[in-house]
């Protein structure tokens, strides 16, 4: 039986505490990512580290998969440390990539993507938290779509080595944006549901809140990333 499949209905205490912890850790992770990115920019280290962007990508995937696979065995401090390590690695990636976009398209495009991502994420999370509809089936569809997106993206990466396909890339970005907006909605509903049922069961509750914080963190980060790609593509076509 998985960590999410257990029966939490015996205790409905402190739902606000659980939700606050999820969004608190998500915010902390975003702050760590932002500070790491700013540090790379301020020191100029992003120029040296730019060629290693793929290392940060694979490292974040590795940390994420490890947390998911070992969550029941890891201690709470270990999960906290891995969450913060993940945030730093994302900061390394964005700290090397965002300055390139700012230099090519202007800093305004970065702020536009950031502001739009914040608004879209906030509205999506609010809808998910307050809607009465059961989004369980939609979550399954979105996860299948996410797998499809990963396969398509890898295929595009290979093909683009031989021929540029800007329109295809733009379509992939829009698809990714839609998927992660949808995941934000369903994950927000999951947070509300678990918050109402899990109560405060010590380590289990804290681990669940950290996992959900990581999910929401990834959602907002990917919304920002796809918006940045879309805005950059639009700027190129002018």
From Swiss-Prot:
Protein name (database record): Uncharacterized protein TC_0206
Transmembrane helix listed as a keyword: yes
Subcellular localization, as worded in the UniProt entry: Cell membrane
Membrane topology summary: Multi-pass membrane protein
Record-stated family: Belongs to the BI1 family.
Pfam families named among the record's database cross-references: Bax1-I (PF01027)
Residues annotated as signal peptide: none
A cellular-component GO term for this protein: plasma membrane
Species the sequence originates in: Chlamydia muridarum (strain MoPn / Nigg)
InterPro entries recorded: Bax_inhibitor_1-related
Main location (coarse class): membrane
Alphabetically ordered keywords of this record: Cell membrane, Membrane, Transmembrane, Transmembrane helix
TM spans (from-to): 22-42, 49-69, 78-98, 105-125, 141-161, 166-186, 208-228
């Amino acid at each position: 039986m998985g960590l999410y499949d257990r029966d939490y209905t015996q205790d409905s205490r402190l739902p606000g505490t659980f939700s606050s912890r999820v969004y608190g850790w998500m915010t902390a992770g975003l702050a760590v990512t932002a500070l790491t990115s700013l540090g790379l920019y301020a020191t100029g280290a992003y120029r040296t580290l730019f060629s290693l962007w793929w290392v940060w990508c694979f490292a974040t995937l590795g940390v994420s998969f490890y947390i998911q696979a070992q969550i029941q065995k890891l201690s709470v401090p270990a999960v906290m440390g891995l969450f913060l390590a993940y945030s730093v690695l994302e900061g390394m990636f964005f700290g090397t990539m965002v300055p390139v976009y700012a230099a090519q398209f202007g800093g305004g495009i970065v702020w536009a993507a950031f502001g739009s991502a914040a608004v879209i994420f906030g509205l999506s999370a609010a809808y998910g938290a307050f809607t009465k509809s059961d989004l369980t089936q939609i979550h399954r569809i979105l996860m299948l779509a996410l797998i499809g997106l990963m396969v398509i993206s890898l295929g595009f990466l290979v093909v683009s080595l031989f021929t540029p396909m800007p329109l295809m890339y733009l379509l992939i970005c829009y698809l990714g944006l839609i998927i992660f907006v949808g995941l934000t909605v369903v994950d927000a509903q999951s947070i509300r549901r678990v918050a109402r049922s899990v109560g405060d069961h010590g380590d289990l509750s804290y681990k669940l809140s950290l996992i959900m914080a990581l999910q929401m963190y990834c959602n907002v980060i990917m919304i920002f990333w796809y918006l940045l790609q879309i805005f950059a593509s639009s700027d190129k076509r002018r």
